[in-house]
Amino acid sequence: MIRGWALQRVWVGLAAVLPLLAHAEAAEEPHRLPLTLAPDDVLATGNEWIALPEIRASDGALVSFNTLFMRERGLLQPNGAAGRPVLEPYLQVGSGKKQPLDGLSWSLLEYWIPQAREERDGLTVTLTYCAPPGHRAAFLRLTLVNHRAEAVSATLGLKSSFGSLSRVTYVPVVLRGERLVAPTPWVDPGEAYSYITYDTRFSWAVVHPGSKATLSMPPVVAAPEADAARTVTLQPGESAESLFVLSVGLEEFSAAHNARALKEELERNGSNAVIAATAAWCRARTRTTGRADLDALMNRNLLFTTLYAWGRTLDTEELVGVTSRSPRYYVSAAYWDRDAMLWSFPGVLDSDPEFARQVLEYALGIQLRNTGTHSRFIDGVVLEDGFQLDEAVAPIVALAAYVRATNDGRFLERYRDAVATLRDRLVSRFDPATGMYSSLQDSQDEFQKLPFLTYDNALAWRALRDLGELYDRLHEGGAASDARRRATALHEAVLRKAVVADAPGAAGPILGSATDGRQHVTTDIPPGSLLKLPILGFLAEDDPLFTRTFEWLHSANYKYSYSDRRYGLPGSYRLPFTSSWTVADELMLKRSHDKAAQILLASPWDAGIITEGIEPDTAVPDKPGRAFATAAGYVAHAICATACQPRR
């Protein structure tokens, strides 16, 4: 089991050097990416401790935020009262009404830090959300510049509200308990919101240097709330800023002092320097293709998979992996080996090899005992049962990719026993009659009556080849030879047993997706598509068997081909649309790269963040699969694998 101290040192050290980093990067202006957003779009930002997944484009309000909790086996998510956002920034000019920021133009600094600007009657308002790495907090900055010919009095404010607390694993479940607001203990000025059952179980705080707050409690209002504001008088050409620090804690003191630490960082170095340091952290994890459009999509999703498929639990300080830290994804905050190791991990390895090492420590630690089981909670306990072969071998494939990329033999030696455990689990699924390996469920998490899945066995072949390499490095010649022998035999078995001779409309034999050695299923399974076989190295892209399979899946003979649709690529009964995995797979194939690239750039996705798929006629993204953090890594990796320039 991974313990937090080793990984914590990395983040604590990072936080300690933030001031130095800010100074070093002061001369480099952060890259600014202008955004075109719809009124109902949201933006996400955050760090390893706190996620801000729903910043509304329409007014800059924060709908919800969350933090990971091992005790809760998922996320804890504060929500505002009666459908309101949890945070609502506003501007009040003179004695007028408090006005939302409803005319914002958005951009991202270094693909991750949301910043919005609004021109209003000779005033410029700028809103920035920033979550510096290493802090159990984020901050919201409001700045105002007076371009008028006369002085102006204005109030910069932030309303906060605590309507409910939800535990999120898959879906939000509202928890029953008491919610209170009170001044932050030993930190002034600020408010601490508490969730209490027999004791405080969670707290969050808003600390606002220079602003004063009015607190309200039921029955006067529906839920605990506060309104923090600062009034300034600006002469022509003058500017002012207000800072609001949002933090999380186990109880009121930790919430307050987590905010205090970031407040002091801001006071010492200034908000511009802290933003610049955060931007520098992001910049160090980006890549370039030489094309601005590809860079924008790739880097936004590299950062999203790094910070939304992975995070640190507030109560145990352990790094954990999840499908997504955003409640917009329909099965958020749970762990799948496939998602973590086959989809997110390649993007993480492209972006940050050191972090990829930490990710593997988690997969080969607390999650190892149930590797291959459908889905688990973040502590490794089974959530949905059912064996899936592709998940069982996923950590082997990821570990081999890491060792190839880094030559980190010491890490491999440390996890020698884990490699043996994974090998034995794979071998236990071997069927002597067919020479293949069985699975209960497929890569789209559905039961398959026919137990031998073609893609899963091709991936198992890849894993056996990888085991041969790993055991060579571990100087275990016998184990290496055995793995290679098994790989060769499996390759032959798949080509003997998984080929369908009479698929309707096919130009010849093609690969089916599943078999029992006699019967076959002719379909595709997009998360574990037959299109991946050349990418795995199992078949050459110009192999006639693969060519016929590719053409059949893209023809009218396959019910879910969507070949007659403008943005159509093969789907399935479970995924009746163009999936993001298929876009990524076809991007990595020579024959379909150009069409996949066109589809990739045609869709708005979820305001630029990868979703589970898009509508084949319009490229409009599906709603249940929004903010899909692990798939974001897979698509970003596909872009990088085909277009990235070498690191300097």
Regions flagged by a language model, labelled:
Residues 283-290, 341-354, 394-411, 458-477, ...:
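Well-ordered alpha-helical scaffold segments within catalytic/enzyme domains
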Residues 240, 331-432, 454-457, 626-646:
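Aromatic-rich carbohydrate-recognition surfaces in CAZymes
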Residues 301-314, 351-375, 415-435, 485-506, ...:
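Long, well-ordered core segments of solenoidal/helical folds
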Residues 240-241, 245-263, 329-330, 375, ...:
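The feature captures the catalytic groove of carbohydrate-active enzymes
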Residues 333-337, 431-432, 450-459, 473-474, ...:
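Extended ligand-binding clefts on enzyme/binding-domain cores
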Residues 25-88, 113:
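Beta-strand-rich N-terminal accessory domains
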Residues 25-33, 124, 130-333, 648:
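Acidic/polar, glycine-enriched structural segments that form the non-catalytic walls/loops
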Residues 378, 565-571, 597-632:
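C-terminal catalytic domain of Rieske-type non-heme iron oxygenases
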